[in-house]
Structures are given as structure tokens and as C-alpha cells.
């Protein structure tokens, strides 16, 4: 990472709509693209020449940028251009800085890469030369605490360069690494990693203003914890009191003092909710607890059908359903076509789609998530008739 700082005249700070370019995390770009479209349904999200880059129309101050699991960085008024040579790029950046100056805030240059980057371009040299451009524009170089960062991203997949002022101080680290499921006081080996749980909530529920997240089989509380930490309202339900008490401890450990957990039955959500609780929910997230089925000997298919029917009764929005599958090669740059989907552990795909249809959910897309050599997961997105 190379950083330099400067000072320039103040730029306008209005909240008019403009274009941003989003840099996405590499662990699953296709899911990150889907999450982005869900969080910004009116943003005209467009994938660029790399699966880790997208263009979006936005104001630039939406809270959704700060809660997305898949966003690495946001370039305000960003530009994505094919790599030609450094001289051409520096000329482009000079013109861009004349149009979008930073103002009196201190600033830095941060250059990084996706994949192998661009072989004949040194990030260190490029960042230094951009600092030179800023100096010739009467910028004061300051290598300490930037108030704004000018970003330059070299993408190896597309051989393009993305540049612009970065929102919220530049590329952000993956905050979920500090709250791994295995670090919680109440842990089960089946717990989802927080970044996947966060993405699932965002995909199912959409923008923050849409409403409350339903987690009808909360288990150790992963989905509900991520919803609450995103400042969503949420309800986590489980039939097992041990799970409810453990999920409460986990949420308190994560830094929240709210209590969104309810002991109840996933197959009868409406009856499990506190009296007068407002419905519909904006989305449902479901990772059925196979292997520790709190509903005893109930058949997998019957349990899933009853739960999905109960959720559809109180949800107007999306469903994210995560199911175990046979392993298959990684597929992180696109959703699975129907003939690419791996066999599920407990259902045939025909049976699953029949269950969805019979419970008023419409299958939309599925993505594969690798777990280990003998197990995978499939994340399925569906919508209900009310949303359709």
C-alpha cells in the first residue's frame, strides 16, 4: 500500500445522484454483485469488465455501503479505463482531479491490485507519480492522517485501471474476521461464517428501510446477529431454549444489548411472534439445522415445507435458503445454471423447486459455496408472490 497526502480547494458536497464504481471482495464476486443489486434496487447496477467491479448510480452517502459484506471500496465519480500506458493514465487522472478536486481536506493516494495486477505497471511508482500530479496542482503532501484517499485499482482480470476519490477513507478490511463464529461464547460447528450470514441477510431483505429480517431457525443466532449489527430490526426464532439463550450471549458478545430472540416454532411463525408484532417481514433467511433437528424426527422435506409456508405467510420480499450439497468445482464469478447445480444432500432439485412453488416462493437463482473436499453449500434466492 502506498499513501501520499495533499490539500486542495473545496469541492461541492451536495447529495445529487451520481455514478460510483464499486470494488468487490474476491471471496465470492457473484454473490457480492447480487447483494449490491439487492441493497440498491434503483441503482442500475452494472457489472463491468471484471466480476469484481460494478457501476452504480447513487448519492454516495447511503448507509447500505457500510453494511455490505461484499464491498471492498467505493470510488465516487469513479472511472474505469483500459490500461494503455502510464503516461496516458496520468493525463486522465490529471483531468479527473481538475474536475473533482478534494478541497481543503488532507488526502492520500492508495494503489492496490486485484489478482496479478498489470505486469508493466508498478503500484509504488504510479502512486508516487500521482502524488507528483497533485504537487503540481499546488497540493501539500502529507504522509500522516488522510481525511480523504484517492484510489487506484489495477485489475488483473480485465487489465483495466479504476480510479477516483474513495468513500469512507478507502478500501475497508473485512470486519467479520474479528467476530468469527468459532470465537463466540456459544458455538456449534454448523455455524455460518459472519460474512456469508451478513450477505444472506442483505440479499433477502434489501435496503435498510424495507423492514424487519426473519430468521425462523436461528440456532446460534448468526443471521440475526448480522442483521442487528447492520442496524436492521430482526427476529430470531428457535424451538430450543438452549439455542435462544446461547444466541443471546453471542449477540451480547458482538456488542449489542438488544434482545431480538424468541422461543417458538419455525413452522408457525405468526403464532410465535409477540402479540401485536408488525408484519410483513422484508425478508427471510434460513439455514435448516440438519443433524441437530430441534423438531425431532420430522422428515426434512415436511419440515422445510412447513417452515417456508409459515415464512411466506408473514414475509413480503426475498428468501435466502442455504442447503448442504455435494462438492463441485468453485464457481464464484456467476450464478449456477440449472445443469451446473450440484446434488443436494437431502432433496432432489425437482423436489426442492416443488416445495418452493407449493409454499408461494419462486426460485430465482442459486450460487455454490465451497466448504471442504466432501461438502458444499448452495445459496438459493427466491421471492414470494407478494413481491413478484
Which stretches of residues belong to each language-model region?
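Short acidic low-complexity segments
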Residues: 140-146
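Class I S-adenosyl-L-methionine-dependent methyltransferase catalytic core
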Residues: 5-71, 114-121, 125-126, 136, ...
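Conserved AdoMet
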Residues: 55-101
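Intrinsically disordered, low-complexity boundary segments flanking structured domains
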Residues: 92-99, 139, 350-354
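Phosphate-coordination loops involved in phosphoryl transfer and adenosine-cofactor binding
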Residues: 103-106, 210
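Basic, glycine-rich polyanion-binding accessory segments appended to enzymes
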Residues: 109-113
